[in-house]
């Protein structure tokens, strides 16, 4: 075998071995992450919204502590409504959308799982972009502040 071909084949094998260790990511959550990145200030990362207030991140309880936390509260409830659509899992549902001119356009028939989930994510991402991020509300003691 040609040494150049062997080198390329080895590089491909090493790349595939590395890729096999990357956990799969829910497509919808990836799409939501892209929407968030599009709407938030440049100095923030989408991950800074994953453990904020009482509702941004896994679970949620109590009263939202500010406008940004209310965005997450509304998003959680929207996902709850979407889950009532037959065979709809909002966390894994993919959808079609376009990021354009500082807004987000969702495609698909109204009332379908894909469109409802896209609209949930769109509304939340735009809300994030219009809400103040308060550093002191990141990683709060939810047992104390979210009753």
Curated annotation (Swiss-Prot):
Protein species of origin: Bungarus multicinctus (Many-banded krait)
Family, as annotated: Belongs to the phospholipase A2 family. Group I subfamily. D49 sub-subfamily.
Function: Snake venom phospholipase A2 (PLA2) that inhibits neuromuscular transmission by blocking acetylcholine release from the nerve termini. PLA2 catalyzes the calcium-dependent hydrolysis of the 2-acyl groups in 3-sn-phosphoglycerides.
GO molecular function: calcium ion binding; calcium-dependent phospholipase A2 activity; phospholipid binding; toxin activity
Enzyme Commission number, as recorded: 3.1.1.4
Domain of life: Eukaryota
Name of the featured protein: Acidic phospholipase A2 beta-bungarotoxin A4 chain
Coiled coil regions, renumbered to chain: none
SUPFAM superfamilies listed in its UniProt record: Phospholipase A2, PLA2
Binding positions (Ca(2+)): 55, 57, 59, 76
Cystine residue pairs: 54-146, 56-72, 71-127, 78-120, 88-113, 106-118
PROSITE patterns: PA2_ASP, PA2_HIS
């Amino acid at each position: 075998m040609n040494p150049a071909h062997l080198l390329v084949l080895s590089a491909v094998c090493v790349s595939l071995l590395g890729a096999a260790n990357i956990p799969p990511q829910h497509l919808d959550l990836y799409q939501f992450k892209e929407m968030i990145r599009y709407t938030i200030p440049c100095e923030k990362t989408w991950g800074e919204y994953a453990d904020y207030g009482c509702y941004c991140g896994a679970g949620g309880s109590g009263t939202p502590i500010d406008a940004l936390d209310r965005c997450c509260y509304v998003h959680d409830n929207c996902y709850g409504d979407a889950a009532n659509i037959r065979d709809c899992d909002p966390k894994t549902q993919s959808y079609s959308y376009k990021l354009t001119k500082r807004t987000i356009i969702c495609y698909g028939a109204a009332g379908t799982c894909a469109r409802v989930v896209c609209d949930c994510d769109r509304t939340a991402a735009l809300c994030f972009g219009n809400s103040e991020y308060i550093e002191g509300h990141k990683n709060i003691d939810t047992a104390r502040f979210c009753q």
